[in-house]
Amino acid sequence: MTAFRTLDHADVKGQRVLVRADLNVPSENGVVTDPTRIERMAPSIVELADKGAKVILLSHFGRPKGRDAKDSLKPVAAEVAHTLKRPIRFVDDCVGEVAERAVAEMKPGDFLCLENTRFYPGEEKNDPAFVAQLAKLGDIFVNDAFSVSHRAHASTEGLAHVLPAFAGRTLQAELEAFEKVLDKPARPVAAIVGGAKISTKLDLLGNLLPRVDVLIIGGAMANTFLMALGKKVGRSLVERDLVDTAQRIMDEAKAAKRELVLPVDAVVAEKLEAGAPTRVVDIDHVGERDMILDIGPRSIEYVCSVLARAKTLVWNGPFGAFETEPFDTGTVEVAEAAAELTAAGKLVSVAGGGDTVAALNVAGVTDRLTYVSTAGGAFLEWLEGKPLPGVEALRIK
């Protein structure tokens, strides 16, 4: 990865290194419930400390309107210390005298976690005065938070313009994984785009279509495409105002000689609830009272056959209402197939987005794909081809 400055370009020994991490992790009553992001960034910050850096962690947490104890990073800092098995000092401010004094007392190899950057309005406004206050605490800036790099905030983008700036190992791993699937992919490339609504995926579909060889449409958004083909979808979720848009996308795929895959059968029920009576029907035989809630066995088989001939897969969005059994079957079986192909060295597989990660967790394959991004909005914006301010600021000019 030559386009971005990484830690390979940085001499951190004895330096105060401001690391923008993403410590905005799920928690309940002050207890972290999913430490995945912390576990992922741990090797990156341990590397810095082992090279003699004074490691200062910056992050937001939640969406506070000013200082609010429930949005303090203190319990998260404790979880970071637990994960690293190293002491971490927590400071209940991120700028000013208290923070400056704590940084001044650090020794090489020490860790310090500062308080929630969003306690200050200057963070989200990318206020130069707030950036300057943060910059006083460091000699070097490391962005290790891809998941917030689509935000031009003080601690993601602003600092990169006032301090020597580098991509941390976690961010580097994301960028290298993405390069493999869209910038320099092994072909054929298949993309799975699922979820409920086309309206939230229009930019994504527009960016992917010219780049992939096969576009697989899943989830409720497939219903709008089916309606455009004149199929009856009963009481299924559908965006009637986007039927023409779905038709246009299919026309563009045909003109570009891209294969567009839609369900050929479906699992239907009259209610979306666990244990509801279900039927498998051909896509031409969806009844008036039916709701399409998952892809059927023939669709699963066809999607798996597409993946078997692909070399690269990018996946965003589930196939069905995976939160409710048995409507998780399509997503789980396709995920299992992707994991097996990846393990056999036949497929490079990158997936991301909130619902996608949750669905892959249900399938139990998160650690068996090439890379699963925990970055929600940033992953989607990257797939849409949009520049991410926090990443662009690290680009070698």
Labelled PLM ranges:
Residues M1-K397:
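Active-site loop-to-helix "anion-binding N-cap" substructures in soluble metabolic enzymes
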